[in-house]
Amino acid sequence: MADSVRRVLEEMVPELEDMEQKGYFSRGEIRVIVQKRQDLEYNLQRRAALKKDFLRSIEYEKSLERLRVLRKKQRNIEGASSLSDHCIVRRTHKLYERMLRKFKGDLSLWNDWIQFCASSKSARQMSKALTRAMQLHPNSAAIWTYAAAWEFEHNHNAT
C-alpha cells in the first residue's frame, strides 16, 4: 500500500513544482498539500475504501482548484497554459473514475461527476461520463435526457 501511495505522490511532483514556479502556492503550502493528499490517498488505498473517503478527496481537489483560480486572478498570473492549469481538474476526474469503478450503481455519484464535467468545461470527460452512465443505468430517463440535451446543445448533433 505504501508503494502505491508513494507512486501517486511521485507522479504529482512536476505539477506541484509548476504551481510553485508560477506562484500559485508557496513551498510551505505545497508541503501541506502533499501531506493532505498523502493522508487522503492512504484512505483510498485501504482494502475497504468508503464512499465518503472518495468524496472527501474530490472535495479537497475542488477547493484547491478554486483557490488556484482565485490566486491566478488576484496575482494576475498570465502566460502560456501549463501543467498546473489543468492538473487539479484532471486529478479530480481520475478520482471520480476510481470512485465510480467501485460504486457503479450509485446514480447520485454519476450525476455529481456529470455536473463537475459541465462546470469544468471538460467535454471529453463529459462524453465519457455520459456514455458510461447510460451503459450502466439504461433505465435512467434523467441521464438519457441530459445526454441528448448536451449532445444537441454542445455538439450541435441532433441525431
Write out the residue ranges for each language-model feature.
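Alpha-helical solenoid scaffolds in eukaryotic macromolecular assemblies
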Residues: 1-159
